[in-house]
Regions:
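N-terminal glycine-/charge-rich "phosphate-binding" loop or analogous flexible N-terminal tail
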Residues: 6-62
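Phosphate-coordination loops involved in phosphoryl transfer and adenosine-cofactor binding
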Residues: 12, 84, 140-143, 241
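Glycine-rich adenosine-cofactor-binding loop
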Residues: 19, 113, 121, 140-161
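Phosphate/diphosphate ligand-binding glycine-rich loop within oxidoreductases
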Residues: 63-136
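Rossmann-like adenosine-cofactor binding region
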Residues: 73, 176-283, 409
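Oxidoreductase and adenylate-handling cofactor-binding alpha/beta cores
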Residues: 121-137, 162-163, 309-318
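NAD(P)-binding Rossmann-fold cofactor-contacting core
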Residues: 163-181
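Rossmann-like dinucleotide-binding domain for NAD(H)/NADP(H)
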Residues: 241-244, 248-412
């Protein structure tokens, strides 16, 4: 697009962005400085804000608003603004956005579905290797139940598949969609089967697995609500040897029922990254958890930055501008950029590989030591850099017997 054409599209854009969006300056600075209006003396601005404390007065003259999940975007926030032309959330969840209100005002909205799915899957894997070491568990003998077969559940499924760990998926929405697609194909006589091939099971079947990992959005009401999906009734049916991992939304588990269960002496092993009532967590529950963290499962550098990239692409599309940047332009090398493996794959090697990139015990320790002095949001804002497996290149020597590291997401040496 020629710069003169751009000047007609963009007039002194004020882009407001959450201060915790990585590479926002790099992605968006040129978009707000393109040429600004016919007189040429207006300047666009790129303005960071603190997500939890954003006010209507602050964003009264925003053209573009880019948030994360802690900012409620609704009439209360936007009633003073009459020029907003784009709202983006650099997150997978959208329950903090009043999409009906935005639609009523014809304000385009974009989120970043799947942006941190890999990060969350790697958090779960790190938790599993930590608990396997702590309790001498053979991961290959466990069955994992995944609640939610969307982006995050699918990435976890892929990693478990790479490790040969048996797992089951419960997702009634996807199961219904699968059945409907099969009906349509049969009715149309379509010889090519394009349906989702996965076998979905009931919630009861998943809750009987050795490990239960939750990956659903918060849904209140409707045919398949997830609000307090795990409650007193089904939590009390779990047995002492099970592991429960929640890295989705805090309201999916009734935290008070979970606390009552543990106070009664139940042996359930709990990994909690999300909490009811964030940022105010049920403090009494923390000592009963194996791993406790501050809603950071999706906080890898890649996961957060992918959200910035997806919103940049969406805004470029709306402005009819060719995207100039991609995430690879900005990602730094990992602290250990490459390793060579000359042994056969084993749980010991898995333990070493996962912890080398991300040891969830670091975040658990920070949470327990600093929650009461720093606060929940501060732990998220000041989260230390964490990379995904893909940041590390793994070379396999010829005598190794499997490419599991690459199937887990570690990079291959480019030829």
């Amino acid at each position: 697009v020629h710069i003169n054409a751009i000047s007609q599209l963009v007039q002194a854009m004020k882009i407001f962005f959450d201060e915790n969006m990585p590479f926002a300056q790099e992605f968006f600075s040129e978009l707000c400085h393109l040429n600004m209006g016919h007189n040429g003396d207006e300047q666009g601005e790129l303005i960071p804000f603190s997500g939890r404390t954003l006010t209507a007065e602050q964003v009264a003259d925003a053209d573009v608003l880019l948030v994360r999940s802690i900012t409620q975007v609704n009439e209360q926030l936007l009633h003073l603004n009459d020029k907003l032309s784009f709202v983006g959330s650099a997150t997978i969840g959208t329950d903090h956005i009043d999409q009906h209100y935005l639609a009523k005002r014809n304000i385009p909205f974009h989120s970043a579905p799947g942006c941190n799915a890999i990060s969350v899957a790697e958090y779960v894997l790190s938790a599993l290797v930590v608990l396997a070491e702590r309790y001498l568990l053979d991961l290959s003998s466990l069955t994992v139940g995944i609640v939610g077969g969307g982006n995050t559940g699918s990435r976890l499924s892929e990693k478990l598949l790479a490790l040969g760990i048996e797992h089951k998926i419960c997702d009634p929405l996807l199961a219904e969609k699968q059945a409907e697609n099969q009906r349509q194909q049969q009715a149309q006589g379509d010889p090519i089967d394009r349906t989702d091939k996965r076998k979905y099971v009931s919630l009861a079947e998943v809750l009987a697995c050795d490990v239960i990992s939750l990956h659903v959005p918060k849904v209140v009401g409707g045919a398949h609500p997830t609000f307090q999906l795990l409650n007193e009734e089904n939590l009390t049916q779990l047995h002492d040897e099970q592991i429960l991992i929640s890295a989705c939304r805090g309201d999916v588990i009734d935290n008070h029922a979970l606390l009552a269960l543990k106070q009664a002496g139940h042996g359930l092993k709990i990994v909690l990254d999300v909490w009811q009532g964030e940022p105010d967590v049920l403090e009494a529950l923390i000592p009963y958890t194996e791993i406790a963290t501050a809603h950071i499962a999706g906080y890898s550098l890649e996961g957060k930055a992918r959200g910035s990239e997806m919103l940049y692409q969406a805004l470029c599309q709306q402005l009819k501008i060719e995207p100039k940047y991609q995430l690879a332009n900005f990602l730094p090398p990992a602290s250990i950029p490459a390793i060579e493996i000359n042994q056969n794959f084993s749980q010991i090697l898995l333990n070493q590989l996962v912890k080398m990139v991300y040891d969830v015990r670091r975040d658990d320790a920070i949470f327990r030591q600093q929650l009461f002095t720093q606060g929940f949001d501060s732990l998220r804002k000041n989260y230390p850099v964490r990379r995904e497996f893909s940041a590390v290149t793994v070379t396999l020597s010829p005598n190794t017997d499997s490419d599991v590291p690459h199937r887990l997401g570690f990079s291959k040496m480019s030829n």
